[in-house]
């Protein structure tokens, strides 16, 4: 990867989720939301899912869960071999103080990803695209610069944002709303939360060097819900 970053500088601004699965907990539950995401990605048009939910409900975990499904080969043929690249918007904006500098950098990233083929771009807190890179004098922001790639179909996008930021920023960009399919990510219920934590129990026991007694997780989840 380091050699690739030297020859392909656009890789400095993205993280390939497929290559970073080992450091993340597996996605447990959320089958309905993940299936809906896959269905949208397989469409011919409006094939860019937008995960909208409160902070902490697991929107980013869904992107990693999809990457894991792709690596396991458990996806439709249209998604087989796809790579999910998370765009680092903060790094992308850093040091771009001159007009045209941001546009040039973003275009280089998108062209690099397009040439890779079978690419999906994941943008966490996608509402930050609106206004990003705009320097005045009629210059475009990132959301406008991405529209040709959103329309072209060669690159698919997954975005995530909160309801508050969606209503405040994203919903006002008609072009983005038209190109993304909203998928609501609700907070899991008590039963689903217990199922999720039970699935992660062994990892936490190993990390903390403890053994959780039977019933402790159900009690903790129920008490937290209250």
What annotation goes with each model-predicted range?
Residues 5-10, 25-37:
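N-terminal pre-P-loop "Q-motif" helix
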Residues 2-21:
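Conserved ASCE P-loop NTPase core motifs with emphasis on AAA+ ATPases
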Residues 67-80, 92-93:
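Post-Walker A helix-loop "phosphate-sensing" segment adjacent to the P-loop in P-loop NTPases
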Residues 32, 43-65:
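Walker A/P-loop nucleotide-binding motif
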Residues 47, 83-84, 114-121, 152-159, ...:
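Loop/turn-to-beta-strand initiation segments
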Residues 41-43, 107-111, 123-156, 162-175:
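Conserved catalytic/switch belt of AAA+ P-loop NTPases
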Residues 76-77, 120, 167-175, 182-226:
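Conserved C-terminal "switch" segment of AAA+ ATPases
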Residues 85-114:
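Short glycine-rich substrate-engagement loop in P-loop NTPases that contacts/grips substrate
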């Amino acid at each position: 990867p380091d050699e690739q970053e030297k020859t392909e500088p656009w890789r400095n601004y993205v993280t390939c989720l497929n290559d970073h699965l080992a450091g993340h907990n597996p996605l447990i539950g959320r089958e309905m939301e993940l299936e809906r995401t896959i269905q949208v990605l397989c469409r011919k048009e409006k094939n860019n899912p937008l995960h909208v939910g409160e902070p902490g409900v697991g929107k980013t975990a869904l992107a990693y869960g999809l990457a894991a499904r792709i690596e396991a080969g458990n996806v439709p043929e249209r998604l087989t071999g796809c790579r999910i690249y998370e765009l680092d918007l903060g790094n992308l904006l850093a040091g771009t103080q001159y007009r045209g500098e941001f546009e040039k950098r973003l275009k280089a990233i998108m062209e690099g990803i397009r040439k890779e083929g079978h690419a999906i771009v994941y943008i966490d807190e996608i509402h930050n695209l609106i206004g990003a890179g705009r320097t005045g004098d009629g210059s475009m922001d990132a959301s406008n610069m991405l529209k040709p790639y959103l329309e072209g179909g060669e690159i698919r996008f997954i975005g995530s944002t909160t309801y508050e930021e969606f209503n405040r920023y994203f919903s006002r960009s008609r072009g983005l709303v038209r190109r993304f399919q909203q998928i609501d990510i609700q907070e899991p219920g008590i039963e689903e939360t217990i199922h999720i934590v039970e699935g992660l129990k062994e990892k936490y026991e190993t990390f903390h060097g403890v053994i959780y007694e039977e019933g402790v997780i159900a009690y903790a989840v129920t008490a937290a819900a209250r």
